[in-house]
């Protein structure tokens, strides 16, 4: 199996970059201690006092907003962030977690990191996903990867993890999607899976066909009144036959995937869909990845929301569809199977679906096919993110 061959042409460095105060986790080199990060966090905790980290953050955001070489979207987002930071400093108040957000966020995507946090030699922070994308883009362009903030060189040997920031981020509060209460980010997953009284659960009689889904605190009442335990054997056999058919389809899918994994030519890569707008009078949102190389060919992925309907914002049901485009020339038809799965740093739920297409110079793009997201809630999670990070698998079928 070939290794991950990642996208070129812009990379995360081209996305909006917010400045992060260099006092947080700054070290003289990869081996530097993370003590300054803890000191900055302690200073930021002072109630009602505009700390140096917040002031420095506001100044650097203003500089990023005024940078004439920065992309327009980056300048706009940096200007908005600078206004918010300046307002927080002027007020000298606000919740600690809100003030720390701009200090601890990734300098590339401006989101709080979900996993590992890396820092350049000047202390600018990058989440694991953006860090990997910067390195991959530079490799494909045959350039030295640089920090999007200070332009110092970055690599796996020059950058180090910042454990102080990782631990600080894990303690910041985050809202439960079911009960809307706040918990430390490190405890939120366990709460949502095991403890939340409003989490969605299933009836214990689902094995004999009960379709009920509901909040956990209603489970006992439902199970006491559930009609499925009293059904006759003939009624249950009909339900079990339907469940067996569904199980057979699922097994057929996984057997097909295992068969594809035995192919000689297999490629995979992490892809990053970025949002764009059409030039129409009423603009429409669409997504596109930078060019990337897999199986020695150049490709691009595009995606659209609700099949580009006129007003997807008025629909309660949200879907994404995508197409794969071959950008390089081929001397013979290229028959491939492909599928998209969630990326290594995201938690979106996607059901694997295998698609098949024969690429030629005349027919070099697939039709739009559904991105098999579990439901509209998962789709909204993707749409709410600044970028959509997925993993593409390509299997070349040889005659």
From Swiss-Prot:
Taxonomic superkingdom? Eukaryota
Q: Which residues form a coiled coil?
A: none
Q: Supply the alphabetized keyword list.
A: Cytoplasm, Metal-binding, Zinc, Zinc-finger
GO cellular component annotations, sorted alphabetically?
cytoplasm; nuclear envelope; perinuclear region of cytoplasm
| InterPro entries according to UniProt | Sina-like_RING, ZFTRAF1, Znf_RING, Znf_RING/FYVE/PHD, Znf_TRAF
Q: What is its main location?
A: cytoplasm
**Cellular localization per UniProt:** Cytoplasm; Cytoplasm, Perinuclear region
- In Gene Ontology terms, what is one molecular function of this protein? zinc ion binding
- In residue numbers, the region (Disordered) covers 1-21
Assembly description: Interacts with LGALS3.
Q: What is this protein called?
A: Zinc finger TRAF-type-containing protein 1
Origin organism is Mus musculus
The gene that this protein is the product of is Zftraf1
